[in-house]
């Protein structure tokens, strides 16, 4: 028992299931970060579209902006800098998320190496590949017989 507490019992999972749970948690975090990045990149793209659409227009022209669920009338001169600031802020958040993503990927890779985790999806793909190959054989046989 002394060896368990000496090795940092909180850091070492007690069994295989705990390792699996920790691994799945890390993969889930990565998935959430990817999802957040995708959403924010979409917002950056939308901000760019708005900027490109209103930039060439007369600066005193009316435009409407949604602020906290309320549509507010402003001028392009007032709205354009705010939209640009929002876009810049979103781009900064995306950059930070990419940095976090790289750290989490490295952490996951180290975790996989430490516990010798191998993805078993390759076996699933082989089984799926055999099924597809069986289907493909039927197609190939038909194609082969028509070419003879």
UniProtKB/Swiss-Prot annotation:
InterPro entries: PFD2 (IPR027235), PFD_beta-like (IPR002777), Prefoldin (IPR009053). GO terms for molecular function: unfolded protein binding. The keyword Nucleus applies. Pfam families: Prefoldin_2. GO terms for biological process: cellular response to gibberellin stimulus; cortical microtubule organization; mRNA processing; protein folding; response to cold. Induction: Accumulates in response to cold. The keyword Chaperone applies. Residues 122-134 have a biased composition (Basic and acidic residues). Keywords: Chaperone, Coiled coil, Cytoplasm, Nucleus. Residues 122-148 are annotated as: Disordered. It is found in: Cytoplasm; Nucleus. CDD domains: Prefoldin_2. Binds specifically to cytosolic chaperonin (c-CPN) and transfers target proteins to it. Binds to nascent polypeptide chain and promotes folding in an environment in which there are many competing pathways for nonnative proteins. Together with other chaperonins, contribute to the regulation of gene expression by modulating the spliceosome function on pre-mRNA splicing post-transcriptionally by acting as a co-chaperone of Hsp90 to control levels of LSM8. Required for microtubules (MTs) organization and dynamicity. Belongs to the prefoldin subunit beta family. This is Prefoldin subunit 2. It comes from Arabidopsis thaliana. The gene is PFD2.
């Amino acid at each position: 028992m002394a060896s368990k507490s000496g090795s940092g019992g909180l850091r070492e999972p007690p069994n295989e299931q705990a390792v699996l749970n920790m691994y799945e948690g890390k993969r889930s975090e990565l998935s959430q970060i990817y999802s957040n990045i995708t959403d924010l990149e979409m917002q950056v793209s939308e901000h760019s579209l708005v900027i490109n659409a209103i930039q060439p227009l007369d600066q005193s022209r009316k435009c409407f902006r949604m602020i906290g669920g309320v549509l507010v009338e402003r001028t392009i001169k007032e709205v354009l800098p705010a939209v640009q600031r929002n876009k810049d802020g979103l781009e900064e958040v995306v950059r930070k998320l990419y940095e976090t993503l790289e750290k989490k990927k490295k952490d996951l890779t180290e975790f996989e190496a430490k516990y010798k985790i191998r993805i078993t999806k390759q076996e699933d793909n082989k089984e799926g590949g055999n099924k597809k190959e069986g289907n493909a054989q039927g197609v190939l046989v038909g194609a082969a017989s028509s070419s003879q």
